[in-house]
Amino acid sequence: MLTGVTRQKILITGASSGLGAGMARSFAAQGRDLALCARRTDRLTELKAELSQRYPDIKIAVAELDVNDHERVPKVFAELSDEIGGIDRVIVNAGIGKGARLGSGKLWANKATIETNLVAALVQIETALDMFNQRGSGHLVLISSVLGVKGVPGVKAAYAASKAGVRSLGESLRAEYAQRPIRVTVLEPGYIESEMTAKSASTMLMVDNATGVKALVAAIEREPGRAAVPWWPWAPLVRLMWVLPPRLTRRFA
């Protein structure tokens, strides 16, 4: 859905590398003001310097943020908003890909994934909605995954569950805000080259970072309720995953 609305001031979590940094570069090239946060401030500082040199007319604010520090999330969002003069789009992108087979005795890895990808996402969602409700409008973008469509066996079980939770929260919000000027988009990326996917054993239908980021940004700008990206081949595959019995989902993991 094309809304005709330009979201000028964009906040991205997990912006120090991978898809987050890629989206920041793409939006900067379009002249958007950016509020970028992540744990690795050295990379954020380098990214800000790079973008400020290329696009001197845009505003860029950066801040350290561990999204698992729940009390800091609203503080950092508010500080970044003040620096660039408001926020009208929040991209909940921060996440990790740790995981172990369920029952392997490595609870810590699966717990960390659920906490970072789902619980911390909920904190970011609540914070963004509070900001948007105060300003009267906004666009909330939730980065889920094609693995959030169906449970998968193996080391990505907790990751898939965390992204399914994000997708479900997004669906609830789309219904909740259907008649209000706050739009909610759930994106389900397939395998896109990044630091996270570099550690993955699966490279199924992997696309390079530039191609993946281009697809993500194009989808974000359309502001759909939900989209698999890149559309081909993942939109048809997502439909297939819905109906596959669990024992046949291993290839997607």
Curated annotation (Swiss-Prot):
It comes from the Bacteria. This is Uncharacterized oxidoreductase MT0971. NCBIfam families: PRK08251.1 (NF006099). Belongs to the short-chain dehydrogenases/reductases (SDR) family. Its EC number is 1.-.-.-. Pfam families: adh_short. The keyword Nuclease does not apply.
